[in-house]
Amino acid sequence: TTDADNAALVPATIVGQLRNGLGQCLTSQDPKGSDGTPVWNSNCAGNSAAQTVIYEGDGHIRIGDRCVDVLGGYTKEGTVAHMWTCYPALESQMWDLNENGQLKNRASGLCLTIPGDTTRGATQAVISQCSDTSKSQRWTLTEASGQ
C-alpha cells in the first residue's frame, strides 16, 4: 500500500491518545510549551493535556497548540522528535499511521520510535527504521470518549 492509502485508514480528525505496544503514551513535556519542547513516552493518564493528541487527516499530530516534528526537518535515523509550531505543508510534521500501527514520517520515511523498546518514562522519541518487531513503534490511536 502507499502512504496515501495508509492515510485513508484514519478518519479526518481524531482526538485521543497514542499508545504504543508497550502500553506507554506519547506525551509532550509541556502541552503549553514553546518550540523545541520534548516529546516522549510515559504512563498513560486519563485526561492528561500532555497526552491528548489531535491526529489530523493531513497527518499532523497536535498536542496543545504545537505539532510533533522532527528536529530541524532532518531525515537521519536517531533524530529526535519534539513539539514545534504547526506548518501546513511541512512534511517533517506529517505522520501516516499505517496498517501495522506505525507512524511513518513523510519527510524521512522513518517511524516514530521510543528507543530501546523501553517503558522507562521520559525517553525522548526519535525516528528510526521501521521494524515489524518493535513494540515501541506500534501505535494505537485511542479515541477520547465523547468524541
Regions flagged by a language model, labelled:
Residues 2-34, 49-76, 92-119, 137-147:
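Extracellular glycan-recognition/adhesion modules and their associated mucin-like linkers
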Residues 32, 76, 86-87, 131:
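Alpha-helical protein-protein interaction elements
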Residues 37-44, 79-86, 124-129:
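Aromatic-rich beta-strand patches that line glycan-recognition/binding surfaces
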Residues 45-48, 87-90, 131-134:
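Short coil/turn segments at the loop-to-beta-strand junctions that recur within blades
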